[in-house]
């Protein structure tokens, strides 16, 4: 399992019409990308990357569980074979508490039309 406490959050709707969700610490980062029109692109729908392009891919997320305290991400091992067993992620949300509601709203919009997002209180 990859575990880290994120101290930085960035959400963005880019000029290229992408939704980007990014969490990072001094040693790790997680980036999720999706087209803002929520339609799959040439390589897939939702792009996942953690700690480098070696551990990136499209449509590899099986489930993302979020709460105000943390995100837990499970990847589909069959779709993420190149991830070398890095299929489970736990990211503590050590970001400003005032930013957490907006981050959760962004994730709801980001995962609209999928069954990947599970919210916990």
Predicted regions and their residues:
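Short polybasic amphipathic segments
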Residues: 19-21, 45-47, 71-73
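Mixed-charge, glycine-accented linear interaction segment located at domain edges/termini
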Residues: 86-121
């Amino acid at each position: 399992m990859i575990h880290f406490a994120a101290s930085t959050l960035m959400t963005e709707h880019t000029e290229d019409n992408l939704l980007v969700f990014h969490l990072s610490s001094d040693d790790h980062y997680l980036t999720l990308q999706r087209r803002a029109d929520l339609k799959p692109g040439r390589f897939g729908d939702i792009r996942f990357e953690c700690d480098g392009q070696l551990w990136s891919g499209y449509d590899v997320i099986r489930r993302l569980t979020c709460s105000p305290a943390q995100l837990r991400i499970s990847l589909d091992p069959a779709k993420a074979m190149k991830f070398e067993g890095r299929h489970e992620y736990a990211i503590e949300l050590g970001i400003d508490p005032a930013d957490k509601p907006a981050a959760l709203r962004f994730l709801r919009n980001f995962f609209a039309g999928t069954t990947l997002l599970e919210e916990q209180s």
